[in-house]
Swiss-Prot record:
It is found in: Plastid, Chloroplast thylakoid membrane. Although originally identified as Cyanidium caldarium, these sequences derive from Galdieria sulphuraria. The chain crosses the membrane at residues 69-93, 134-155, 178-200, 255-275, 291-312, 447-471. Keywords: Chlorophyll, Chloroplast, Chromophore, Manganese, Membrane, Metal-binding, Photosynthesis, Photosystem II, Plastid, Thylakoid, Transmembrane, Transmembrane helix. Belongs to the PsbB/PsbC family. PsbC subfamily. This is Photosystem II CP43 reaction center protein. Its main location: plastid. It comes from Galdieria sulphuraria.
């Protein structure tokens, strides 16, 4: 196979000690990359690159299985998941495994089985990675033409893209099948405080599903993050599955149009940069989704959202003071605004005090108390249920802040510095990883464009100006 870049052209760029370092027969002279460039050394050996990716998948699946078993071994049934530092069991609980009414974990055996299945899968992937790295053919196209590829073969690259899209579509439909036919999923909006149920009537109306994409990302609109019912969520996965599978078939059967051939850089590093950009975007969206959405990420498992904890505090003190005889409808706070209840500028009745900024919160424990124009005073005076009080009191002291004392008006327990919400972990990790993936996209995109334009990679250290300068002393 013709090599896109001269392999020896750039090896002088590295420091001299790299010239003598060789891993698996791949030195800087033979590949154009130093040992620390990792898989870049495997750009032109598709079989070994496959081995690296399969082994990487094995490591990921091994961590998932081992960490799941670790969380199962440390699980305490008397405490909620979010108070135990669990970051994997909440996902499994959301899928409806081992969960009862109100989000109570009633059976951890499914989690044990899932953890073991992941460990077994990781062993298979690990063996495959070792085989393709050490024993299998170096170049797939010589032994298995169907699996071989040339980075510059635009038709083959879009075919591979199509296969990936079909696999993503199948993944979306797996959730749909689980929700509709195999045990259902956990719905935090189910009456009485949440329960596992089948989603029998997913939303298929394109005006509803794609209407989320046309919403403003600000305030109460919330773009796609504003999904607040399981019918829309599962219906969205049906649409995404159809689009991904349809797009995959399209890319397999067609060749890139002329404008696409001219617009994109067609090299291994360019495809890496495109992938990093996509992952970065998904990371940033997931970050905001986890932080604000309590439908896809139920508060019973992930802990309350920040706005939810704040509104829960206002609600808890309203309940307390109302029992002590306070008229919560007319009481004034220190600023002259309503202490417990007030009207928003549009006239909607909302909680007063510092939590007024979170007026757009929607939560299962609060919605039964709303009327046609915000919070219903009659319901607040006569229809607050014990389960709503208990849940609000719990959420009030478990805000995803990691703070020792009150921040933003949210009360915390005196030992709350020991509590870090899984919602905080997920949000922060997705933001940080999304940021670094974006930086990596810029890095690799710049390198790919420079290589395509024929620019020099790096500096020729034999002719650096500093070498001809006088010593400092």
């Amino acid at each position: 196979m013709k090599i896109l870049y001269s392999q020896r052209r750039f090896y002088h760029v590295e420091m001299p000690f790299n010239n003598r370092i060789e891993f698996a027969g791949r030195s800087i002279e033979s590949t154009g990359y130093a040992w620390w460039a990792g898989n870049a050394r495997l750009i032109n050996v598709s079989g070994k690159l496959l081995g690296a990716h399969v082994a990487h998948a094995g490591l990921i699946v091994f961590w998932t299985g081992a960490m799941t078993l670790f969380e199962v071994a440390h699980f305490l049934p008397e405490k909620p998941l979010y108070e135990q530092g669990c970051i994997l069991l909440p996902h499994l609980a959301t899928l409806g495994w081992g969960v009862g009414p109100t989000g109570e974990i009633i059976d951890t055996y499914p989690y044990f089985v899932i953890g073991v299945l992941h460990l077994v899968s990781s062993a298979v992937l690990g063996f495959g990675g070792l085989y393709h790295s050490l024993i299998g053919p170096e170049i797939l196209e010589e032994s298995y033409p169907f699996f071989g590829y040339d980075w510059r073969d635009k038709n083959k690259m879009t075919t591979i893209l199509g296969i990936h899209l079909i696999l993503l579509g199948i993944g979306a439909f797996l959730l749909v099948i689980k929700a509709m036919f195999f045990g259902g999923v956990y719905d935090t909006w189910a009456p009485g405080g949440g329960d596992v149920r089948y989603i029998n009537n997913p939303t298929l109306n394109p005006l509803v599903i794609f209407g989320y994409l046309l919403k403003s990302p600000f305030g109460g609109d919330g773009w796609i993050i504003s999904v607040n019912n399981m019918e829309d969520l599962i219906g969205g996965h049906i649409w995404i599955g159809l689009i991904c599978i349809g797009g995959g078939i399209w890319h397999i059967l067609t060749k890139p149009f002329g404008w696409a051939r001219r617009a994109f850089v067609w090299s291994g590093e360019a495809y890496l940069s495109y992938s990093l950009a996509a992952l970065s975007l998904m990371g940033f969206i997931a970050c905001i989704y986890v932080w604000y959405n309590n439908t896809a990420y139920p508060s019973e498992f992930y802990g309350p959202t920040g706005p939810e904890a704040s509104q829960a505090q206002a609600f808890t003190f309203l309940v307390r003071d109302q029992r002590l005889g306070e008229n919560v409808a007319s009481a004034q706070g220190p600023t002259g605004l309503g202490k417990y209840l007030m009207r928003s500028p549009s006239g909607e009745v909302i909680f007063g005090g510092e939590t007024m900024r979170f007026w757009d919160l929607r939560a299962p424990w609060l919605e039964p108390l709303r009327g046609p124009n915000g919070l219903d005073l009659n319901k607040i005076k006569n229809d607050i249920q014990p389960w709503q009080e208990r849940r609000a009191a719990e959420y009030m002291t478990h805000a995803p802040l990691g703070s020792i004392n009150s921040v933003g008006g949210v009360a915390t327990e005196i030992n709350s510095f020991n509590y870090v919400s899984p919602r905080s972990w997920l949000t922060t990790s997705h933001f940080v990883l999304g940021f670094f993936l974006f930086v990596a996209h810029l890095w690799h995109a710049g390198r790919a464009r420079a290589a395509a334009a024929g620019f020099e990679k790096g500096i020729n250290r034999e002719n650096e100006p500093v070498l001809s300068m006088k010593l400092i002393d």
